[in-house]
Amino acid sequence: MHIELTEMLRCPEPHREEMLVLSTGEVKDRMVRSGLVGCPVCHKEYSIARGIVNFRRNKERVSKDSSGPRPAYTPPSPLPSADAAKLQALLELSGPGGYVVLVGSAVRQAARLSALMEGIHFVGINAPTEMEEQPSLSLLYANEKVPLRTAIARGVVVGADLATSPWLVEAHRVLLRGRRFVVENEEPELPIGLVKLAAENGLWVGEKR
């Protein structure tokens, strides 16, 4: 986890948002490899191991047997690697800085997107188990709530495997107003507050009001 992301984290428990407290173990090139983040409100602690912050109650990575929302839709053709440039265009980001949140299988796009969008840090939520952190990618695992503060992301992409209502609501919450919201599902069950821009080729694209 990039050390500066600490300021954007929130405890997933149902209480007011408050900045978490970081206790570092190993830090390498501004990436926290081990340590803890603690909540000053409910006093829960969440471990950081191999650079990954685990907010899950069962302390495991995402698996077929894990709790939380499960896939409800598989697009006719998932976004291929060659379409990273298209995804960049859909996000409509100009200039470096800030965070883009990738949820579920969309985290696989991080390496290709970072090559196209220099200076932006990507935050992967419940990434596929083979994924590892990168200098431009921090990984977080959680049960049902994205462990990020409200309205901090310049863009959000939700993968088909987690394109279900609870995760879409959370992805909407962390997105800044006026920014793009992309889902690998042409007909997602979307929260209110999004303006539809397009829906084709297995993707839904909108903007937060």
Question: Residue locations for each model-derived region?
Answer:
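Residues immediately within or flanking Cys/His clusters that coordinate Zn2+
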Residues: 8, 36
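Short cysteine-rich clusters marking metal-coordination/redox-active sites
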Residues: 11-14, 39
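Conserved class I S-adenosyl-L-methionine
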Residues: 89-122
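A short acidic, Gly/Pro-enriched loop at the edge of an enzyme's catalytic core
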Residues: 97-98, 134-160, 166-170
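Short, polar loop motifs at secondary-structure junctions
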Residues: 105-109, 123-131, 185-188
